[in-house]
């Protein structure tokens, strides 16, 4: 790990995605994108038809993930993405689907 990576501040964001985001491979595609961006955390379906995620990484990584979540995989129809930074000491080991 480089010195820059060690110095980089780790941020954690809680995200909700609304629209046609269940039954379209959204969680699976989110895991793939998170792995490509070297993010950690999780993604899950909620009973109200939305998808929630906790994403953890550098600010630049999170910005790229939020941009991707605004459209998601091809079959998804995202209408809204909301997010807020969360303060936590917890460090996720990987990004996974719940």
Swiss-Prot record:
Look at the named UniProt entry and state the broad enzyme category this protein falls under. hydrolase
Task: Report the EC number(s), separated by commas if there are several.
Answer: 3.6.1.7
Cross-referenced SUPFAM superfamilies: Acylphosphatase/BLUF domain-like
Does the record's keyword annotation contain Hydrolase?
yes
Q: Where is the Acylphosphatase-like domain?
A: 12-98
Catalytically driven reaction(s): an acyl phosphate + H2O = a carboxylate + phosphate + H(+)
Q: Which UniProt keywords apply?
A: Hydrolase
Q: Which Gene Ontology molecular-function terms are recorded?
A: acylphosphatase activity
Catalytic residues as annotated in Swiss-Prot or TrEMBL: 27, 45
Q: Record's Gene3D superfamilies?
A: 3.30.70.100
Kindly list the residue ranges recorded as spanning the membrane.
none
Instruction: State the source organism's domain of life.
Output: Bacteria
State the family it belongs to: Belongs to the acylphosphatase family.
Stated name of the protein? Acylphosphatase
């Amino acid at each position: 790990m480089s010195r820059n990576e060690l110095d980089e501040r780790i941020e954690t964001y809680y995200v909700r995605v609304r629209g046609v985001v269940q039954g379209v491979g959204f969680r699976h595609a989110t895991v793939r994108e998170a792995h490509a961006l070297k993010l950690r955390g999780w993604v899950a379906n909620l009973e109200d038809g939305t998808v929630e995620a906790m994403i953890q990484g550098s600010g630049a990584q999170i910005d790229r993930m939020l941009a991707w979540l605004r459209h998601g995989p091809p079959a998804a129809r995202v209408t809204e993405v909301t997010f807020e930074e969360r303060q936590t000491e917890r460090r996720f080991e990987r990004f996974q689907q719940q």
